[in-house]
């Protein structure tokens, strides 16, 4: 069944443009509240958000919907996505909501939903919500005496800070480390520097002055250049770049080099395997992860299980097959011993623990493998189905034949933006570049002809 509202990470779009309108947000509140209004106890929902200007609008619309459906609402304010997942469980809420478009610009926003167990909702539940959204939603409203209440909750941000601190092994402190952190002017602008400082680090912070429109603006995990500059300026030992809702992380080593999610997963998997705490015999990643990671793990006797793109699918595979490390090249790192979704700060602490215990530099710890040449380009689309065009299909088949057994090709529509992503990797960088450029040209032509 086709999905009408939900993408790979909730509902997302440009603010005040369908589907990111106050009307739909209120309807989502009613629909979700109706589905989770089970049993005779008083039902509750927790709502967090990042620092986007439109967060105020969507927050109030969701509150109207949930209270109209008979749920009490706890408003957490600006707080990371993994904190919402954690507090949904901790506060025994029926549902958790994060208002965020993650790494997207401020003009976008989104609604992510978590079940009472702290995990993102299944495809089946999202389809059930979509079905309700297209019906007479107002027939589901609570009786007058059962309308919910809403209140702002103070102090839960500190509960999350304490949770994060407990994920660092007790025999490790961060004393002696100078850490530069970029909070992307987003949800972690308070919690991340506080947690690192309380663990003993000297902390230099950028991207911690949100104004509603500067989230992810030339900062954060998708724009690490500002962090690289600051790291050199203050001679930090490590740089940590979070995204707008802090569920992904990118590291910058002491030389100013980028360490992506694939390398971070390699570090954690290698460390946990040595400690006999790695489960599943390997890790879970998506089709976008580098072939070099797969080869590195294979040399260690570990496996790489691949899923389609989206951390929710990584988590689903982890749960079904008893893995405890998974993630994405983009920096979503899921460590199920600690949480139910990607947590940039928790992942960074695992790397810092390895650095402190080994006495090595960040570059020595984090350069686990040589990435296979990989190139990713995006083709923006406004409609049509260029991937069903016969000429495009033939070009894809030719590209796969050219790579043969020496590389991989991944072509997929983005689940969060109107893009088609074209990725190829292989040992021959010139061949990879030609394949990607040729395919981008063919898809662009098919798009124009549609």
Curated annotation (Swiss-Prot):
HAMAP family: GlmM_B (MF_01554_B). One of its GO terms (molecular function) is phosphoglucosamine mutase activity. This is Phosphoglucosamine mutase. Its EC number is 5.4.2.10. The keyword Isomerase applies. Binds 1 Mg(2+) ion per subunit. It comes from Agrobacterium fabrum (strain C58 / ATCC 33970). InterPro entries: A-D-PHexomutase_a/b/a-I, A-D-PHexomutase_a/b/a-I/II/III, A-D-PHexomutase_a/b/a-II, A-D-PHexomutase_a/b/a-III, A-D-PHexomutase_C, A-D-PHexomutase_C_sf, A-D-PHexomutase_CS, Alpha-D-phosphohexomutase_SF. Belongs to the phosphohexose mutase family. It holds the Pfam family PGM_PMM_II. The keyword ATP-binding does not apply. The lineage of its organism: Bacteria, Pseudomonadati, Pseudomonadota, Alphaproteobacteria, Hyphomicrobiales. The modification Phosphoserine is found at residue 102.
């Amino acid at each position: 069944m086709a999905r009408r509202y939900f993408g790979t990470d909730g509902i997302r779009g440009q603010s005040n443009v369908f589907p990111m309108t106050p009307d739909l947000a209120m309807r989502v509140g009613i629909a979700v509240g109706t589905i989770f209004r089970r049993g005779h106890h008083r039902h509750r929902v927790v709502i967090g958000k990042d620092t986007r200007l439109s967060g105020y609008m969507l927050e109030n619309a969701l509150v109207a919907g949930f209270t109209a459906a008979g749920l009490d609402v706890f408003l957490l304010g600006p707080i990371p996505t993994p904190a919402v997942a954690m507090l949904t469980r901790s506060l025994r809420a029926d549902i958790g909501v994060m208002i965020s478009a993650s790494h997207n610009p401020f003009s976008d926003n989104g609604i992510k939903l978590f079940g009472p167990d702290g995990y993102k909702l299944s495809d089946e539940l999202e389809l059930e919500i979509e079905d309700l959204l297209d019906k007479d939603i107002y027939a589901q409203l609570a009786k007058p005496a059962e309308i919910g209440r809403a209140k702002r909750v103070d102090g839960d941000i500190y509960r999350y800070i304490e949770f994060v601190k407990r994920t660092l092994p007790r025999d490790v402190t961060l004393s002696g480390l100078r850490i530069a952190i970029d909070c992307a002017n987003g949800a972690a602008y308070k919690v991340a520097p506080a947690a690192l400082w309380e663990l003993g680090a000297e902390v230099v912070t950028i991207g911690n002055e949100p104004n509603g429109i500067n989230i992810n603006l030339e900062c954060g995990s998708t724009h690490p250049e500002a962090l690289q500059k600051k790291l050199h300026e203050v001679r930090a030992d490590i740089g940590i770049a979070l995204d707008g809702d802090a569920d992904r992380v990118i590291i910058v080593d002491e030389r100013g080099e980028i360490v992506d999610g694939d390398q971070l997963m390699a570090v954690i998997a290698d460390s946990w395997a040595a400690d006999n705490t790695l489960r599943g015999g390997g890790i879970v990643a998506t089709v976008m992860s580098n072939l070099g990671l797969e080869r590195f793990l294979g040399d260690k006797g570990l496996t790489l299980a691949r899923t389609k793109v989206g951390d929710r699918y990584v988590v689903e595979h982890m749960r079904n097959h008893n893995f405890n490390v998974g993630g994405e090249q983009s920096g979503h790192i899921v460590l199920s011993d600690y949480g139910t979704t990607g947590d940039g700060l928790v992942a960074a602490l695992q790397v810092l623990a390895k650095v402190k215990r080994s006495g090595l530099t960040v570059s020595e710890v984090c350069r686990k493998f040589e990435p296979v040449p990989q190139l990713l380009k995006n083709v923006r689309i406004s409609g049509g189905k260029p991937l069903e065009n016969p000429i495009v299909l033939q070009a894809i088949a030719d590209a796969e034949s050219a790579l043969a057994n020496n590389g991989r090709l991944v072509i997929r529509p983005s689940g969060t933006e109107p893009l088609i992503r074209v990725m190829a990797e292989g040992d021959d960088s010139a061949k990879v570049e030609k394949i990607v450029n040729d395919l981008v040209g063919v898809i662009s032509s098919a798009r124009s002809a549609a």
